[in-house]
Swiss-Prot record:
Keyword line: RNA-binding, Transcription, Transcription antitermination, Transcription regulation
Protein name: Transcription antitermination protein NusB
CDD domains according to UniProt: Terminator_NusB
Species annotation: Haemophilus influenzae (strain 86-028NP)
The keyword Cytoplasm is annotated on this UniProt entry: no
Gene Ontology MF annotations: RNA binding
GO biological process: DNA-templated transcription termination; transcription antitermination
């Protein structure tokens, strides 16, 4: 008898975070407005299983608060923003937005979700980098 590992389907919120990272990436590299990116994303992407209102909230609020988010990240990264991988930047931006503004989400959940999203979209070792940066940022924001 062979055992099959059951693959757990990502939660609707995880899918919302994955979509938010993709939309933040698109926004950063395309030069399009947040509204254009959001509309194109919702129309063109597979949004099955996504908590769409949560996606919209995360994307809009991260963009709206981008200066605060980037200011919070800057002291904890080892290079300039423009030298970071754009996917890593998008993941960090989303996670730091959540750490700063979504206080009902436990910081361990924020960090774990960022790591899991990095495993899906990032380079081979990017989840380790994301974890290291967020482990420094969370206490600085009073989230530990």
């Amino acid at each position: 008898m062979t055992e099959q590992k059951q693959v757990k389907k990502p939660s609707a919120r995880r899918r919302a975070r994955e979509c938010t990272v993709q939309a933040l990436y698109s926004w950063a590299v395309s030069g399009n407005t947040a509204e254009q990116v959001e509309l194109a994303f919702v129309l063109d992407q597979d949004m099955d299983g996504v908590d769409k209102p949560y996606f919209r909230k995360l994307f809009r609020q991260t963009v709206e608060n981008i200066e605060t988010v980037d200011f919070s990240i800057s002291p904890y990264i080892d290079r300039a923003f423009d030298e970071l991988d754009p996917i890593e930047t998008a993941i960090l931006r989303l996670a730091v937005y959540e750490l700063c503004f979504e206080l009902d989400v436990p910081y361990k959940v924020v960090i774990n979700e960022a790591i899991e999203v990095a495993k899906v979209f990032g380079a081979d070792e990017s989840h380790k980098y994301i974890n290291g940066v967020l482990d420094k940022i969370a206490p600085a924001l009073g989230r530990k």
